[in-house]
Amino acid sequence: MLNRIIYDPFNDGLDTEQHFEKIHIKTKQRTKTKSITIIENIPEKIDLKLFLKKLKYTFHCSGSIQQNYDDDSKFIQLSGDHRELVKNFLIKNSIVKESNIVMHGY
């Protein structure tokens, strides 16, 4: 079994010397009353499975990790409109700074 080190953003805190790409948080309308929240450009050193698990537990929603086939990147998809909650969650847990978050759909 491989012993891999996983970056846990909930324990490590924000490292001020690291440069992250801007995280994009947007929503897409599925039907007239239902929507999904998409979180893109999550830093590669964050374990997406653990991050998704924390988001689903915190917001009481379903979610999944999706593959973007245009550039082979991964993003998180949550059911419902959770843009503000995700933004506050990222800032509160010191995962990224507020200046590195881009909100779409306002």
UniProtKB/Swiss-Prot annotation:
PROSITE patterns according to UniProt: SUI1
Keywords: Initiation factor, Protein biosynthesis, Translation regulation
Pfam families in alphabetical order: SUI1
SUPFAM superfamilies linked: eIF1-like (SSF55159)
GO biological process: regulation of translation
InterPro entries documented for this protein: SUI1, SUI1_dom_sf, SUI1_euk
PANTHER family: EUKARYOTIC TRANSLATION INITIATION FACTOR SUI1 (PTHR10388)
Family that this chain belongs to: Belongs to the SUI1 family.
Function in brief: Additional factor that functions in concert with eIF-2 and the initiator tRNA in directing the ribosome to the proper start site of translation.
Protein's recorded name: Protein translation factor SUI1 homolog
Organism the protein comes from: Acanthamoeba polyphaga mimivirus (APMV)
Phylogenetic classification of the source organism: Viruses, Varidnaviria, Bamfordvirae, Nucleocytoviricota, Megaviricetes
